[in-house]
Amino acid sequence: GITSNRGLCGGFNNNIIKKVNGLLAGEFSGYNTKVISVGKKANDAFKRGDKGFRPEGIGAAEDMFNDLTFDRASQLAQYLMDEFQAGKVDKVVIIYNKFINAASQDVMVEPFLPIIPTVSEGSSSTGDYIFEPSKTEIVEDMIPKSLKIQLFKGLLDSHASEHGARMTAMHKATDNASDLKRDLTLEYNKARQAAITNEILEIV
């Protein structure tokens, strides 16, 4: 689950935590499921239970956004691929906020492993091609790169969504504070006017 390190961003983090808990209680209930938390908020939510998991040897995943680089994302992606190839896990999904615009984010549950091949609709004629290097070598090289890019994209999407959610939340907070200030100023002026009127009546 990918969250942020900081709050003040509306329901950004709670939406991810709620989605993860929903999957643990639903689709993944009865399985030995582990949650790798990327971001401090997810780590705080799951470290107290038996689902939170910190991979060894790749650094603390919850600190990813302190230094978000492709290399750090690649380390985590490689760890997930190694665990899958070793048969230690059967399925990996990435849960993150997809950036739509500054005011809107969608919670995504994106399959990571195993890779599900897509089949194109309709018949398409393809000629015979000679691949150099071989098809196998190309696939073995491209798939890990593609998965690393997929994870990095999810992290970047989440990072952009965090800033958008925080900007929107702070804008609403500013508007609410302005409304409150206006209402309090009006109440103060009314009370002050009433006090002055009472003083004038007492003098008369």
Feature names for model-found ranges:
Residues 1-204:
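C-terminal beta-strand-loop-alpha-helix "lid" module of Rossmann-like NAD(P)-dependent dehydrogenases
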